[in-house]
A protein has these predicted regions:
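A juxtamembrane structural motif centered on a specific transmembrane helix
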Residues: 1-3, 331-381
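Short, charged, intrinsically disordered terminal tails
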Residues: 1-6, 10, 207-217, 377-381
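Hydrophobic alpha-helical transmembrane segments of multi-pass inner membrane proteins, especially
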Residues: 18-239, 281-341, 366, 370
Length: 381
């Protein structure tokens, strides 16, 4: 590649997204020194590996990545199935593969594989004469999303399965669906809300047994998370303990926070999973409302910048990949912050680039590398 082309590629990199992502990652490292200092070194290594992966992905021709979407998807499906044979159980789920000194969570990389596979389908199925998708044309991408989502769901990892579902639905919506599909989706959503209301919130006369549709099929901890969300003041020493301690931490931070390492909920270890699921609560308690706004602003830059990459992409595959990566990050941030503030049920979803975890860090950096690749090469198409 000529020097001029290389310079143009560097100029076209999504620097706003990359700088904001690095800033969030460094904030996460700083925050982790208070939440769990012993894990700081490992997370710094994960960040270094993630940056190396990001750079490596930008060097690969996007057309090669597109052609490799099918084997990448199938490889990730195979790794998910392998968990049933040699997976390690933690927190009630068979979600980790142990590779020597490392533990890998295949579901994190499956999200990337699903995005690539669905993007390839929508690219290959481009029909200018019939741009809108009806029920039949949506069956293949739905199957591509449902298969890995169900495998993750039976681990069981409900949180990741939900994130995959919302990411897939975002890609389908971006593909332009017919109004009949929108109406059908609305009806399904209303029916789902009705089922939840019937199973968890409908008043039942004394002495009458509640007839449920899905609740009796749920695991005890899953049922408890929904009942705890709907009844936040109940069972504060059991089901709602996590949520209560998190809300105390977030609320007690006030406008400017208590100061680094001065958070009582954090220092006294009242806050559960403070290095992973509830890392935002640590940040809110110690640094306050203003710093939380700064963090949300950085995530906003990542989201808007990612959508900008999709908008400017001259390649349909690249546009769908960019939207998929943006959706993957957005829904995870949305659910995690909603969870720690009590607005959404606790699902065990980590905060991208902030929470401790190698698989999460590297997979998000891989997604950001794809974004950079799409943005840098858009002038070549």
């Amino acid at each position: 590649m000529q020097l001029g082309a290389q310079r143009r590629m560097i100029v076209h990199a999504p620097w706003g997204v990359l700088i904001a992502s690095l800033a969030v990652s460094l904030i996460g490292l700083y925050n982790l020194m208070s939440a769990a200092r012993s894990m700081w070194t490992s997370q710094a290594i994960y960040l270094g590996v993630g940056i190396a992966v990001l750079v490596a992905v930008t060097l690969v021709d996007l057309r090669f990545i597109q052609s490799a979407a099918v084997p990448i998807y199938l490889l990730n499906i195979g790794l998910l199935l392998l968990l049933k044979l040699v997976g390690t159980r933690a927190k009630g789920a068979e979600s980790w593969l142990v590779l020597g000194p490392f533990r890998v969570q295949p579901a994190e990389f499956m999200k990337i594989g699903m995005v690539l596979m669905m993007a390839k389908y929508f690219h290959d199925d481009d029909r200018p004469a019939a741009p809108s998708y009806g029920f039949l044309r949506l069956l293949p991408p739905l199957v591509l999303a449902i298969v890995p989502t169900l495998i993750v769901l039976v681990q069981p990892d409900l949180g990741t399965a939900l994130m995959m579902t919302f990411t897939a639905l975002t890609l389908i919506a971006f593909a332009r669906v017919k109004w009949t599909v929108v109406v059908a989706a609305g009806v399904v959503g209303l029916l789902g809300a009705g089922v939840i209301w019937n199973d968890f919130a409908r008043p039942v006369p004394e002495g009458e047994k509640r007839v449920t549709l899905i609740r009796h099929h749920m695991k005890k901890h899953q049922e408890g998370r929904i009942t705890g969300w709907l009844e936040p003041e109940s069972d504060l020493k059991g089901t709602n303990y996590h949520s209560m301690q998190s809300k105390i931490a977030v609320g007690s931070g006030g406008f400017a926070g208590k100061g680094w390492k001065e958070g009582t909920q954090t220092a006294l270890r009242y806050l559960p999973e403070q290095h992973t699921d509830f890392i935002f609560s640590v940040w809110a308690e110690e640094h306050g409302f203003l710093s939380c706004l700064l963090l949300l602003l950085l995530y906003g830059v990542i989201l808007v910048g990612s959508l900008g990459v999709a908008y400017q992409s001259r390649d349909r595959f690249g546009a769908f990949v960019a939207v998929g990566i943006a959706a993957m990050i957005f829904w995870q941030v949305f659910e995690n912050i909603g969870m720690v503030t009590g607005l959404l049920p606790v699902t065990g979803i980590t905060l991208p680039l902030m929470s401790y975890g190698g698989s999460s860090m590297v997979s998000v950096m891989l997604g950001l590398g794809l974004l950079a690749n799409i943005s840098m090469r858009r002038h070549l198409f």
